[in-house]
Amino acid sequence: MSLITVDQANRVFHLHNQTLSYIFAVEQGGTLSHLYFGGHVDHYHGELRYPRVDRGFSGNLPGSTDRTFSRDTLPKEYSTAGEMDYHLPAAIVRHTDGANALYLVYQGYRIEAGKPKLSGLPAAFVEDETEAETLTIVLVDQVSQVEFDLQYTIYRDRPVVTRSVQVCNQGDHAVNLEKVASMQIDFTDRQFETITLPGAHANERHPERGSINYGIQTFGSLRGTSSHQMNPFLALVDHTTTEFSGDAYGFNLVYSGNHAFELEKDQLDQLHLMVGINSYNFNWQLKAGATFQTPEVLMVYTNKGLNAMSQAYHHLIRERVVRSEFKNQERPIVVNNWEATFFDFNEAKLKPIVDEAKQLGIEMFVLDDGWFGHRDDDNSSLGDWQVDHRKFPQGLNHFVKYVHEQGLKFGIWLEPEMISYDSKLYQQHPDYLMQVPGRSPSPSRNQYILDLGRQAVRNNIFDQLDQLLKSKQIDYIKWDMNRHLSDIYSVALPPERQGEVYHRYVLGLYELLERLTTAYPHILFEGCSGGGGRFDAGMAYYMPQIWASDNTDAVARLTIQYGTSLAYPISLATAHVSVSPNQQTGRETSMSTRSAVAASGVLGYELDLTQLSSADKQIVQKQVVQYKQIRPLIQFGEFYRLKSPITSNQAAWMFVSPQQDEAIVMVFNLTSYAQPSLTKTKLVGLNPKLNYQNIATKAIFGGDELMQLGFYDPVVYQDYTTKVYHFKAVTEN
């Protein structure tokens, strides 16, 4: 069955699969009008065309006497500046005469099986061309001959449409792109609310639900990365939408740099949404014959609530964004030495941690910051990716060999995008540092940024890392970025092209990652940026897991991991057990609670194992054994949010196997108080016709019973307690 239907007579395009339809049409003057995005309809018969009304101060097409048609009031697929549309434009193009007028007129379309790659950018993909179909709509400005190709891909078996734009300069003169959104969509007669994922360093992705008022709202980042402060994701929901019912529209930008989600509610209560690269300090010179490709937006629609939206993203990102050979493999349990030692370590100090990890069943040791150059603190050596022989007198290979002899894999921390003043790299290539001529650059964590937009810089870093990786038996890389961009300038570009620096940095990063992951496909890469400061689908394309937050406090992590799950799969989010009291919050929590929260993602440990009490070591050893047993279920099962730590004094979630024959349920109590109310937990996602046994108590319940009646939570007079339930389907005697 074709996924794209074209009504040639009425010039209507209908993208459809079993769950959704996306419909738009070519209107008067060659303008694209958005008609519908929502649940599946078999056929569109043309009745839902926008009513034509003469509206004051909303002008008409040039040369037309029809006062009822206006681009200012028409719901559109892509708006531009200068055409008497007073909404925020999706695109702004500056011509050689200084004007920014752009009248994009429909020229034609192309349909192809599958999904083409995007040049230089990460994007969702297909493994077989029957999985999806792609529609390209060609729009051209007749005066400048600048062409906009609007790219739509619909998946056959996923509630997903992806969108991006390619701009082609078919004219004779260069133009400047001052804004190019990846997509636009206009809604009429909908009273939506937004769900966004704002945050801060060590406090990322706290879901916020808000109303939409008249005027313009922008959610985005100006930090050069996707940021801790505002994740590149937004959902539009009805005010009645819950976790398990109601319309939910998700928009997830596959990009790791400055981004913007712009909402405009207009005079007619129409909602106008644009998503793409933030136009702040963006100005791209597009020469004659050149093209520019925008990042991709992953759009999801469901009428079954937020959990269904999240599950669509979980499957899509895990299966068709992450490319690594590890995407379907169980991830190793690691111990990282950072919170155990910080910079104060040597080989002799690390070996006991490795020995203890072996005894506890941990599978990988990760050597964090401080192993290279002469780095005893954060003031030096970034850019010098050679081992510090003071700490490893016999070389790094000697220590790696020791780790492997204990039966553990070996991982290492890198921060390749940064440079220290006190480094050999800076002494040799001071021009590699990003700074504005005549001005002192701003430090952050005593470090500075390499200009990754330059090929020479990328080659230098690649060559250093290549030497490190090809001579060592390294199994894992933690790729960190501990500051945001500032002092935006590149000595490789002329003054009139400095507006390209932000985007060229991201493109350079992607090119470097492409080279490394291609050269070393058997190394597991984990992304990090001071925790979750670059937790986005663009990085997931190269790295199948990302450090969710530098905050390892179990209670804080409940909200962080809850919010992360809205748009990203569990297998992407790493979570570690650390010491108590926690080093970020000072909060005390039990080992069992810390373990359960960390086991709700890709489990690891971030502490000095040699300092654990005998009792805690037994808990860790037991928890490692248990996690290994349920690891496929946690990392690749269906995830359901049951109770929100934001709106209640509990958090609860569960993991269900694809066959619905096994489930793990975790219920977390927050603060204790006298005479607490009785609470129940109702499960979801089970087979109502099966019986399930509680593995701990041997009690048997029907699937329908667990979902309809649920069970009472224990009354516990203690803060931050956790109850974990393990159910398996059984045949009742």
Swiss-Prot record:
It catalyses: Hydrolysis of terminal, non-reducing alpha-D-galactose residues in alpha-D-galactosides, including galactose oligosaccharides, galactomannans and galactolipids. Disulfide bonds: none annotated. Pfam families: Glyco_hydro_36C, Glyco_hydro_36N, Melibiase. Its EC number is 3.2.1.22. The keyword Hydrolase applies. The active site is at D480 (nucleophile), D550 (proton donor). GO terms for molecular function: alpha-galactosidase activity. It is an enzyme of class 3 (hydrolase). Alpha-galactosidase associated with the raffinose operon. This is Alpha-galactosidase 1. The lineage of its organism: Bacteria, Bacillati, Bacillota, Bacilli, Lactobacillales.
